[in-house]
Amino acid sequence: MARNANITRETKETKIEVFLDIDRKGEIKVSTPVPFFNHMLITLLTYMNSTATVSATDKLPYDDHHIIEDVAITLGLAIKEALGDKRGIKRFSHQIIPMDEALVLVSLDISNRGMAFVSLNLKRSEIGGLATENIPHFFQSFAYNSGVTLHISQLSGYNTHHIIEASFKALGLALYEATRIVDNEIRSTKGVI
């Protein structure tokens, strides 16, 4: 069974198109109006070992908020669809990733109970067109829509770029590991996820 998804989400504010294949490492194409966000999405999708296309159009370009939120929603929905009934997935994963002085822990459970707990000390208010207040919001929107319980904690660091990038790398690696097929069972005492 192919584990991929093609999701389009259009509102009065944005149009987001996401193609995601979680089992095939291939080309990654990302186009949003926020340069640093493009860099982080490419990082996330690369460390997920995926093939992906993300295209985001901001119809009402007030600021970066709508793009960040709507890409997170659409990407979350794509992961959820690609996983189907989640039969056989490892389900849990955690990663502790350094980037120079920054050290970030990501722990997740593909539980179908989407929520995020994010503890990052981001000193800069903006980086590459992205308001750093939208970083936790990205993770929250992604977690809610993907059905992933997500914890992200900064263990050390002071460089905003390094902290954010370590977070996206760790999330990508954790998602890759948690979505691997390890058997043919649903990993839950309930029998469903």
Swiss-Prot record:
Catalytic activity of the protein: D-erythro-1-(imidazol-4-yl)glycerol 3-phosphate = 3-(imidazol-4-yl)-2-oxopropyl phosphate + H2O
GO cellular component: cytoplasm
Localization terms from the record: Cytoplasm
This protein's UniProt keywords: Amino-acid biosynthesis, Cytoplasm, Histidine biosynthesis, Lyase
PANTHER family: IMIDAZOLEGLYCEROL-PHOSPHATE DEHYDRATASE, IMIDAZOLEGLYCEROL-PHOSPHATE DEHYDRATASE HIS7
Family stated for the protein in its record: Belongs to the imidazoleglycerol-phosphate dehydratase family.
One Pfam family it belongs to: IGPD
Top-level EC class: lyase
GO molecular function: imidazoleglycerol-phosphate dehydratase activity
Protein's recorded name: Imidazoleglycerol-phosphate dehydratase
